[in-house]
Amino acid sequence: MKYIKTLLSLCCLCCGAAAAQTAAIAPTDPHIQYVGRICFQNPERPRFSYPGTQINVAFQGTTLRMKCKPGSGYFMAQIDDAEPFKVAFRGPRDSVVTLCTALPDARHTARLMYCIEGYEYKPEFWGFQTDGQLAEMDPLPAKKVEFIGNSITCGYGNEGRLGEPFRFETENHYYGYAQLTMRRLGAVASIVARSGIGAYRNYGAPKDGSPADNMPAQYEYTLYNDQTERWDFSRWQPDVVCINLGTNDLSTDNYDTALLKQGYKRLLAQVRKGNPKAKVVFLCGSMLGGKELDICKRILNEVTEEAHKAGDKLVYRFDFSPQTGDLGYGTDWHPSLRQHQRMADELTPFLRQLMKE
């Protein structure tokens, strides 16, 4: 009996030690660094919709696990300066993913970026688990940008191939032009983007537009298609706001150019109200061609010139080179990974100069 009691005591000690080895870190921990539009109405389960949402942390230890709502989708993860890799929360029970283990017991950093659109998955972050403790995270870059866009900005199908159906597994915003540009500039971006969305008319919508769910209808809220929380613009004041819309508005030859211009102007007014000191850049491309490309450029030039005449001199224009297929296509004729690299090659020097002015 004495032997059994001793054995049980040892087991309890071992179990206690094992439990102590992995500590649960709540999403409310002040060491966790967030980037993007995140809803903290339930601070223990923050929600987000848009690609590019970042969750960063530093820790002293050997192991780090991430906990999310099952079925939250895909993240790109980078531990220290190692090669980034994709992690998935796919199944109904996939709530914990090991990001790293058996590392040297030292300070490490983990950077997570949501790399798909969350309008179907409705992702939630539930915290971390570590055998050590959190440490102070590196500060965010000083240069801040906001990208407002459609599937091009999302990275729709950039890891896929022309002719195959779209799957979220082949969408990777991390390797899209926006994030490639940010890494080259040493800047950080918040993203408001959804495939199929327009400045006035979403893809395939009637000629009179999509007033309930186009970008002006969505821009002032934290989450996509969810009006429970208005976005607090004081949480993110970018130096530059890049707007890349128009491809869906001008789709299927069923558009109204006057309404498109109104949509751009309405969105510009919203952006300027929320970000009074930001430089705003209207981007065009890289999927449009022919007549629609000419229309998009003309309207954006008009909106920019009219803003200047009205006293807003901080509105700019930039055109990407139209894709030609020489770099291949992603799913549904969308930019390939190589096309996104070319777009970043073009946008990076423009934004670098703009941020110096």
Question: Which functions belong to the PLM regions below?
Answer:
Residues 154-158, 200-202, 250-252, 325-329:
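Short acidic/His/Gly/Ser-rich catalytic and metal-binding motifs that mark active-site loops
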Residues 144-148, 153, 189-193, 239-244, ...:
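Structural recognition of the beta-strand scaffold that forms the well-ordered cores
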Residues 3, 9, 18-148, 152-173:
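N-terminal secretory targeting modules
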Residues 52, 119, 163-262, 288-302, ...:
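Conserved SGNH/GDSL esterase-like catalytic core that processes O-acyl groups on lipids
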Residues 71, 276-277:
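Proline-centered flexible-loop/turn and helix-kink motifs
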Residues 279-284, 292-330, 339-357:
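Extracellular serine-dependent O-acyl
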Residues 140, 273-275:
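Short, conserved loop/helix-junction motifs that constitute active-site signature segments
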